[in-house]
A protein has these predicted regions:
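Short, Lys/Arg-enriched N-terminal segments with co-localized hydrophobic residues
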Residues: 1-8
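Bacterial N-terminal signal peptides that target proteins for export
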Residues: 8-17
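Bacterial N-terminal signal peptides
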Residues: 17-26
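Acidic, Gly/Ser/Thr-rich repeat motifs that build Ca2+-stabilized beta-propeller blades
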Residues: 30-170, 218, 223-231, 282-320, ...
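Short, glycine/acidic-rich beta->alpha junctions
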Residues: 42, 146, 205-209, 333
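Short, solvent-exposed aromatic-acidic interface loops
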Residues: 110, 138-142, 200, 255-257, ...
Length: 366
């Protein structure tokens, strides 16, 4: 048997090697930029989505079911009336918002019979401080009492509306071709479902195999739709969406189970499944995403901004061609959990802090 001091030394060496592994293979560059951080308006508990109305006026959702109009120049904040009822349980509630002209799109967890909920898309006209003529454009056909994995990020691109649905914590539904669960949905601007992009998929399904989409954006040059989603323990990923593609969850994943075991057979690639263009290990719990194409921060121009819930930080991903090549943390633990990211017309960066005492923040050149 080995002497006790040798056992201790072996254990110490293993610990040192483990630390060195994480330093060299999981390092993130921290390069915070000099910014002026301003809190805009009164606190909003757990804000989730932001979209510009016009000028300095923006809409901000709160997960509890409230919608606010906020003037980022004055901080004035006004509630919007006639918001649809929501299933405000755990991750559910009033989630993303996108506005174009006077038309407002809301993605939310819609209350259904027997205590269940479904991810849904709602459309209305904003007139003054109220929504008018509201209608539900889409309701998922997968109902659950679960308060997890609603997805719900929206982007408008060309003639279509795209939005991502999570699998509600029931992973196998992401591969069920009869369900909208774990899918990106595509609707025409009139609210009609676009043709299915894959064989035997329901109308409107553009892609499948998603776990929990939390960020979506249109690339300003290529027009491609980029989407990021949460993995389990590790394996958060960015995908460039292709019509008819299956992104693999839960058959393929770069993450592991929360208890440490393999997800399924532990596959990170398999025939018939699309690969991500970026993977985070360990997870950062990404949320919100925006391409930066303004001049206020020239060092960020042409890159991608991603918020992190887990590390309460803002990430900047530099692109090589049209794919991510490297990342750096440019704002670290200043405002809490970053839920959404948007770039204002003047180049300032708008962030939502998902905290009980959260709200809207503006980052500008110091």
């Amino acid at each position: 048997m080995l002497p006790e001091r040798v056992k201790v030394m072996n254990k110490a060496i293993k610990n040192i090697l483990l630390i060195l592994f994480f330093i060299f293979f999981n390092n993130v560059v921290y390069s915070e930029i000099k910014v002026k951080i301003e809190r805009i308006g009164a606190p909003i508990a757990h804000p989730w989505g932001i979209s510009q109305i016009e000028g300095t006026h923006y809409l901000v959702t709160a997960r509890s079911g409230e919608l606010f109009k906020v003037d980022i120049a004055t901080g004035q904040q006004q509630p919007i009336a006639n918001v649809p009822a929501v299933f405000a349980k755990r991750q559910g509630g009033l989630l993303d918002v996108v506005m174009e002209n006077s038309r407002v799109y809301l993605c939310y967890s819609r209350p259904m019979p027997d205590g269940k909920a479904a991810t849904a898309l709602y459309q209305a006209e904003l007139r003054g401080n109220a929504l008018r003529g509201g209608q539900v454009l889409f309701t998922s056909n997968f109902l659950s009492t679960s308060g997890h994995h609603f997805g719900c990020r929206i982007v408008l691109a060309g003639d279509f509306i795209y939005f991502g649905l999570g699998e509600r914590g029931e992973r196998d539904t992401a591969q069920d071709n009869a369900l909208y669960s774990g899918a990106v949905i595509r609707l025409a601007r009139d609210g009609s479902l676009a043709p299915a992009s894959g064989d035997n998929w329901p109308k409107g399904v553009f892609s499948k195999g998603h776990r929990n989409p939390q960020g979506i954006a249109r690339h300003p040059r290529t027009g491609e739709i980029w989407l990021h989603e949460h993995g389990p323990k590790g394996g958060d990923e960015i995908n460039i969406l292709q019509a008819g593609a299956n992104y693999g969850w839960p058959i393929v994943s770069h993450g592991r189970e929360y208890y440490g075991g393999k997800v399924g057979e532990g596959l990170t690639q398999a025939a018939g499944f699309a690969d991500p263009v970026w993977v985070w290990i360990p997870s950062i719990a990404p949320s919100g995403m925006a391409f930066y194409d303004k001049d206020m921060f020239p060092e960020l121009k042409g890159g991608l901004l991603v918020g992190s819930l887990k590390f309460r930080s803002l990430y900047h991903l530099s692109l090589d061609g049209e794919k991510p090549a490297s990342e750096q943390v440019i704002l670290k633990q200043k405002i809490g959990r970053i839920r959404d990211v948007m770039v204002a017309e003047d180049g300032a960066i708008l962030l939502l802090s998902d905290e009980v005492n959260g709200g809207l923040y503006r980052l500008s050149r110091d």
